[in-house]
A protein has these predicted regions:
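Charged DNA-binding/catalytic regions of mobile-element recombinases
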Residues: 1-136
Length: 136
């Protein structure tokens, strides 16, 4: 999860990326950093992809990802959960790097008035530019 600044407070971006293709498989923007936010993102990923049998989903050890609810959802989908070592973001470097690129290339160019404006802008960046035009 990464923080997106708006004039009304933070928005929280949850992202699932394919580490092989570097494409964003699913994302969601929330007004709160909750288990429900990361569950919605995972459900979007499942609906958008034909995924192989042996899927490993890697995340940090944030409370959203270590919650019983999230672990049960992963188990329901038959996924293996892999964690970064606590306080060691390098294990999740590809996603951390992508969040940095998103912010430098796009988010910091704007001053979002509200959540909806941030959502529309990030939607355009991911769906119309990053996944379809930007070289990975």
């Amino acid at each position: 999860i990464t923080y997106i600044p708006t004039q009304q407070g933070w928005a929280y971006l949850s992202t699932i990326m394919d580490r092989y293709t570097k494409k964003v498989i699913a994302w969601d923007l929330g007004k709160r950093m909750t288990v429900e936010l990361v569950q919605r993102t995972l459900n979007k990923a499942i609906k958008s992809q034909d995924y192989p049998e042996a899927v490993i989903l890697h995340s940090d050890q944030g409370s959203q990802y270590t919650s019983l609810e999230y672990e049960e959802l992963l188990k329901y989908y038959g996924m293996t959960h892999s964690f970064s070592r606590r306080g060691y973001p390098y294990h999740n470097a590809s996603l951390e790097s992508w969040h940095g690129h998103l912010k430098r290339e796009w988010v910091y160019q704007f001053k979002y008035k509200n959540f909806e404006e941030a959502y529309q802008s990030i939607f355009w960046y991911i769906e119309a530019f990053y996944n379809s035009k930007r070289i990975h």
